[in-house]
Regions:
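Conserved N-terminal segment of class I S-adenosyl-L-methionine
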Residues: 1-156, 164
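Short N-terminal helix/helix-N-cap motif within the alpha/beta-hydrolase-1
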Residues: 133, 174-179
Length: 232
């Protein structure tokens, strides 16, 4: 079993009743099954532990990143946009991340996790959408990463598990922002840190074209939106 999976097996709990979970690994050391004490099992698909399945409010994000899986990765687009934003938000140097156990909340396709992994951190990324599967594929070259599909309101981790928890550009997309935020501090170690940011929606900024367009496109079916984009 890889080191990240050994760590994960010690901190995982059932997100619905908070009881410990048992993980089973194959001969290569990869987790292949997760079971609760009450006999409930959760699938492990393409390396992703899936506590959700089915559809949810984040489906559009998952579909978006399935179509454009590497768009935001610095390693793909040749920029340092993700790196600069990530380290700027954390106010840390990359060397300070080495060896830390990090929780990426709303990991998307892994744009920020990639930076942390390159710095030598151990990263667990969680996303409510199918983007978790995209992150697992994008970052499979890293043996210190594990993706989970789960709910920010029902985190599958014991209290005080992580050295660092970050949630960047995610909270404003959740149905209940306050509840989402309050779910994060309990999983941070007493000596750890939590970094959260959000989009500042001043009245003036809401008049921008992208927000006006979003009011329209958010009501359209995905295929309709894509057809419009192709024409434009």
């Amino acid at each position: 079993m890889t080191k990240i999976d050994k760590i994960l097996s010690k901190i995982l709990i059932d997100p619905y009743d908070q009881t410990p979970l048992t993980t089973t690994a194959n001969d290569e050391g990869d987790i292949i099954s997760v079971e609760s004490q009450n006999g409930k099992s959760y699938p492990v698909i393409n390396g992703v532990i899936d506590f959700e399945g089915g559809g949810n409010y984040a489906d559009n994000f998952g579909d978006q990143w399935t179509r454009f899986p590497k768009l935001q990765l610095d390693s793909f687009n040749g920029t340092t946009i993700s790196r600069d934003r990530f380290l700027g938000a954390l106010k840390l140097s990359s060397s300070e991340l080495r060896g830390k156990l990090i929780f990426d909340v709303g990991c998307g396709t892994g744009r920020f996790a990639e930076i942390a992994l390159e710095s030598g951190a151990f990263v667990i990324g969680l996303d409510y959408s199918s983007a978790a599967y995209v992150a697992a594929k994008n970052l499979k070259r890293y043996k210190n990463f594990r993706a989970i599909r789960g709910d920010i309101y029902k985190l599958p981790f014991k209290k005080h598990s992580f050295d660092l928890v970050y949630c960047l550009g995610v909270l404003q997309h959740t149905p209940d922002v306050e509840r989402a935020f309050k779910s994060l501090p309990p999983v941070v170690k007493h000596s750890g840190s939590l970094t959260v940011d959000y989009y500042w929606k001043r009245f003036r900024s809401l008049l921008g074209w992208k927000y006006i367009i979003r009011l329209i496109t958010s009501k359209l079916k995905e295929q309709t939106t894509l057809k419009i984009l192709r024409v434009v």
